Amino acid sequence: MTFLKYLLILCTIFLMVTNSLSEEIDKEFNIKPEGNLDTVELVLENYKCIFSFAATGGTNENWKIFLTTENGVATCFIGRPKPISYLFFKQFSAQLINTKTGKSNIIPEISDNSGIMPLGDQYILTSDNKVVQSNNFAGNLAFLVLNSDK
């Protein structure tokens, strides 16, 4: 009986620690095709995800920014949940910053409505680890995922 009590206590502590290692926050925002530069950002623990954009064409679209941290690694997702986006992005930039260190070391994954776009094709990673459109950018975005390295 005593062994079962200790086992139950250990399991409870394990669950509490495991749940505290992963956190998430999200925010819905509306992109208006007015061509004006706008910015949305989220902050969670030691991370800040920033998405700046200017879009034209189509109609207003609801997009979502989602930031999660787990075991010291952060992931930021920015995109339109459904359906595909009909906006034409004149420009965009995205960055995931560790606010504690001031560093931004990310692994980006960006998709247009046709699929994943290779780094260097339609977007580039600047020297300060900000994702921006390249000269070849066709104006279409479906989602962006920024993963921090540990």
Swiss-Prot record:
Entry similarity comment: Belongs to the MYDGF family.
A family per Pfam: UPF0556
InterPro entries in alphabetical order: MYDGF
GO cellular component: extracellular space
Organism per entry: Dictyostelium discoideum
Signal sequence, renumbered to the chain: 1-22
Compartments reported by the entry: Secreted
Alphabetized UniProt keyword annotations: Secreted, Signal
Protein name according to UniProt: Myeloid-derived growth factor homolog
